[in-house]
Amino acid sequence: MREIYRSSIFKKWIKDLRDSRARHRIHIRIKRLEEGNHGDCYPIGEGLSEMRINYGPGYRVYFKDTGKEIIILLCGGDKSTQQQDIVKAKQIARLYDKE
């Protein structure tokens, strides 16, 4: 089982999500990711991936798989904010790369 690290931005996004069913579905997908099942995920560049949750407005979770035992959840959003979220995820990942 892999370790999942959640950025503070991701934690705030998931906490502020009003749709409890969506939040539950996202947590299930993260659990599957932790178990090694990436499911509906696509690379978005710079070593990052987008996990698609086909529910509601099309939720997305952006993450970095370090290749070790750690996956970093960077941020989340939905289809309507996809391009801005990708830019934000890449910025957050660069900060983690510096650490």
Positions of the model-derived regions?
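Solvent-exposed, charged helical/coil patches
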Residues: 1-31
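Enriched for short, Lys/Arg-rich terminal
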Residues: 3, 12, 23, 38, ...
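Secondary-structure transition/hinge residues
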Residues: 18, 34, 97-99
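A short, surface-exposed loop/turn module that caps and links secondary-structure elements
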Residues: 28-55
